[in-house]
From Swiss-Prot:
This is Acyl carrier protein. One of its GO terms (cellular component) is membrane. InterPro entries: ACP, ACP-like_sf, PP-bd_ACP, Ppantetheine_attach_site. It comes from Nitratidesulfovibrio vulgaris (strain ATCC 29579 / DSM 644 / CCUG 34227 / NCIMB 8303 / VKM B-1760 / Hildenborough). The gene is acpP. Disulfide bonds: none annotated.
Length: 76
């Protein structure tokens, strides 16, 4: 499973959204209905899955699906 597929699966599991909704340009808050707690849980799930630490400044910049995929890909 690729990084992109793993990130998308985490998003689907954490936010309870379908694969069709998890597009690269989708905003976590505006398009996928995430709130601040959802975003925190999403960051924690990605940290655990990929063994990376995402600091608060970086976490605030992860606003869309593509941002999350790019961030994790660059940390691998």
């Amino acid at each position: 499973m690729s990084v992109e597929e793993k990130v998308k699966k985490i998003i689907m599991d954490q936010l309870g959204v379908s694969a069709e909704e998890v597009k690269p340009e989708a905003s976590f808050v505006e398009d996928l209905g995430a709130d601040s707690l959802d975003l925190t849980e999403l960051i924690m799930a990605m940290e655990e899955e990929f063994g990376v630490e995402i600091d608060d400044d970086d976490a605030q910049k992860i606003l869309k699906v593509k941002d999350a995929i790019d961030y994790v890909s660059n940390k691998q």
